[in-house]
């Protein structure tokens, strides 16, 4: 698929869309304590097709644009089920386990899947406490239903600034949370069988909203990759700065300890000297 290389000026619609999407990504991958924790859906009304997308005289397939091109989120290799399966498997393996009942990936692991792993991991690190709380809500019943799943992800806060009901940040949050819960399920023999249900619920929840909203809001996996790389670089840079500050603080603490020890040594010498003179 070819991609236009339009000038990124403030008057360019594509630039404005990308700026909005970047803001969404930063909002959901931001510093803990400053960002909303909503990666659910505010209301069903948002998922309904808008009047601007009424059926035309010629019936078009879902995802097909006016010029006849197919959006990348309709490509088989980028089915949302593949993202969910890959991330669940990846997250479960992080806990030293295997999801032997995982569906296969007909097209194999894609670069977009690998980027989702990175983004999902970052998201979980920044929302670990919230994940624990929401996971407890979801696992409070013996068997998870789709209705319960929807209720839980809808009550994960409220991000009123989102323009798209399935923004990139919300997408990352849902898959990351699903992987976290799946890993928890695998730790219990009684819950292992429900990982498959969680996979189905997560895939259905996301896929429906992508189909209903991504075309209108000009979202794509291509843009996801571009923004994901930016966020990954920003995160790694911030982490490197933290490590640098910690090392510097340790050096200063060691210098401080050395100065203190030296001062104590000097005081000791002076005191001992005075004692020796007094004995004479």
UniProtKB/Swiss-Prot annotation:
Pfam families: Bcl-2 (PF00452), BH4 (PF02180). GO terms for molecular function: channel activity; GTPase activator activity; protein sequestering activity. A motif (BH2) lies at residues 213-229. It comes from the Eukaryota. Keywords: Apoptosis, Cytoplasm, Membrane, Mitochondrion, Synapse. It is a peripheral membrane protein. SUPFAM superfamilies: Bcl-2 inhibitors of programmed cell death. One of its GO terms (biological process) is apoptotic process. The keyword Transit peptide does not apply. Residues 33-59 are annotated as: Disordered. It is found in: Perikaryon; Synapse; Endomembrane system; Mitochondrion membrane. A motif (BH1) lies at residues 160-179. InterPro entries: Bcl-2-like_sf (IPR036834), Bcl-2_BH1-3 (IPR046371), Bcl-2_fam (IPR026298), Bcl2-like (IPR002475), Bcl2_BH1_motif_CS (IPR020717), Bcl2_BH4 (IPR003093). A motif (BH4) lies at residues 80-99. The keyword Cytoplasm applies. One of its GO terms (cellular component) is cytoplasm. Plays a major role in programmed cell death (PCD, apoptosis). egl-1 binds to and directly inhibits the activity of ced-9, releasing the cell death activator ced-4 from a ced-9/ced-4 containing protein complex and allowing ced-4 to activate the cell-killing caspase ced-3. During larval development, required for the elimination of transient presynaptic components downstream of egl-1 and upstream of ced-4 and ced-3 apoptotic pathway. Has been shown in one study to be dispensable in mitochondrial dynamics and morphology during early embryonic development. Belongs to the Bcl-2 family. Interacts with asymmetric homodimer ced-4; the interaction sequesters ced-4. Interacts with egl-1; the interaction results in ced-4 release. Interacts with dre-1; the interaction inhibits ced-9 activity, either directly or indirectly. Interacts with dct-1. May form a complex composed of ced-9, ced-4 and mac-1. Interacts with dynamin-related protein drp-1 (via residues 280-502); the interaction is enhanced by GTP rather than GDP; the interaction is probably direct and may occur at the mitochondrion. Interaction with drp-1 may be enhanced by interaction of ced-9 with egl-1, but not with ced-4. This is Apoptosis regulator ced-9. The gene is ced-9.
